[in-house]
Amino acid sequence: MIPNFKIKRLIQERSLRKATVEREVAKSYGLAQKVTSPIIRIPYTYNYTVEGDDKEKELTKTGFINFSPKSTAINGQVNTETRERSIFDILVYNSMLDIEQTFDLSQVNLSKYDKYDLHYDEAYMIYGVSDPNGISSEMSFAVNGQTLDSEGLVTNNSGKRSYIKSSPFTLDLSKKINVKTKSSFKGTSSVAFEPIGESFSTNISSPWPHPSFTGSKLPNRYDISEAGFESQWSLNKFANAIPKVWENNHVNIHQSAFGVNFIQPLDEYGKNTRTAKYALLIIVLCFAMYFIFEILQKKPMHPIQYILVGSAITVFFLLLISLSEHIGYNMAYLISSVATIGLISLYSSFILSSLMSTLVLSSLLSSLFGYIYLILQMQDFALLAGSLALFVMIAAVMMLSRNVNWYALKTGPQSIQT
């Protein structure tokens, strides 16, 4: 069991190494992205006086008022690709989003802000992307047909979230405002959306066939195939607690999010971990085969011989781990199993001193490693298949040794009766 523990420890270390490489790639390419849909913001100034030691002092307070949209519709395409770093393949993506929004501010109550001087001619859009380093092209905003450029980044009070800021435009509250936003950004592992507005819908498609939908809401509809996936979310005002208007950063607009993780169903290290869990089963079944030959041929084997066979099986897992990093799990399993079966069969030919017995043992070992491979491909029935294999082997040992005089084993191999 100690070698098995060491094997699992090695797999964990290699897996952590890959995770470190993934983080390095994400820092330079783009982290997991979280998108905050655009909102309108207008700055304000407020002049007031305070009592000083000798005289009144005039101060000016600055801030901004935020307006959430009535409706938001996001259509996005997320294209995935694999980047090679060292011996690892890292999954990354490039996302292109088209966002259409409607703002109806004619009924918004601004009476609580009457004391402020609102600068409607300096209104601007803000659009949140959690990792601005991943932005791959210039953002574009169109407000009622007027094209606005992006002017840089603004942050919230904590400085932890950044938003792309558009060039200013004049806001007319009496008119309905239609906004179109185009963006393209890169990222890794996942993309999520933070809904704002009374009505919010998102349509995302990608060629990646292994999505995992996460967050505060699952898709209303999705379609997954080998060609990729399409998903659709829709929320109404009852599922979205963001108000129509608020001051500064007094409202947490990041309270809920939903999206998709781009998962690799089972990478080489995951497959190796599953394989290592069957190490004890492989060793037990292999020893059982040797024990059957020991009984049938009336030729006791030394414990050292069992240890050497067990060591060969342990090396099988080391070969599997190291080869799978370079040529993939399936080919690594084939090469490692053939090498291990060949080594054990060659060694056994000298122990058994019988070509027929060696061929039978080689066939049984091939069947064992082939059966274990089939178990590893299963998801729901792996435990059942493994249990059945162990049961059949125990039953075979019991039946083949049913006539053995176990007490006679003490007097030497010549006394064994079958």
Tell me what each language-model feature is:
Residues 249-283, 302-303:
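Cytosolic-side membrane-insertion boundary helix
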Residues 23-50:
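Short extracytoplasmic
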Residues 1-4:
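Hydrophobic membrane-insertion alpha-helices, especially the h-region
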Residues 16, 20, 27, 53-256:
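Soluble non-transmembrane domains of integral membrane proteins
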Residues 16, 31-35, 108, 380, ...:
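Intrinsically disordered or highly flexible coil/loop and linker segments, enriched in small
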Residues 10-13, 17, 91, 280, ...:
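Catalytic cores of large soluble enzymes that bind and process phosphate-bearing ligands
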Residues 6-30:
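Alpha-helical transmembrane signal-anchor/signal-peptide segments
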Residues 280-418:
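Generic detector of multi-pass transmembrane helix bundles and their immediately adjacent loops
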